[in-house]
UniProtKB/Swiss-Prot annotation:
Pfam families named in the record: CTP_transf_like
rRNA processing recorded as keyword: no
UniProt-annotated binding residues for substrate: 9, 41, 73, 87
Name this polypeptide is given: Phosphopantetheine adenylyltransferase
Organism, as annotated: Bordetella pertussis (strain Tohama I / ATCC BAA-589 / NCTC 13251)
Lineage of source species: Bacteria, Pseudomonadati, Pseudomonadota, Betaproteobacteria, Burkholderiales
Amino acid sequence: MIIAVYPGTFDPLTRGHEDLVRRAATLFDKVVVGIAHSRNKKPFFTIEERVDIAREVLGHYPNVEVHSFGGLLKDFVRDQNGRVIIRGLRAVSDFEYEFQMAGMNRHLLPDVETMFMTPSDQYQFISGTIVREIAQLGGDVSKFVFPSVERWLQAKAKERREQSAQGGA
């Protein structure tokens, strides 16, 4: 059984992410979507919310699982018996960072391959950061995320606006 691990923050999960998962699910026996705790970022959604969102969107794929992880990716990949790490490349600007990470992962996990996948053409420009910003400003994100994710974004953006109006975090 060949297991692929697709790690990321998925904050939020976009149509581009789902596109890669859908295509990877046809290539591998199992795809594990690993949602990172993101210690170096300030996520819009909590880790629990990101896992719930991903499970809502991806739950209909029989060979896809969603789990959260903290710590090193190498440990998560080992725990999942992963043989391949999937990384998405939207643009040439993504390549340098991803190439360095693939080299480090090869050093830490010599028997695990990194596979770069590009999103389908209609999703190449989508990023979670841009989607979050549009949602926070009240814009339409329906072309970039699934309806359930749009509802999560609207609710979280409203919650944040209310907190700001009250002087909260």
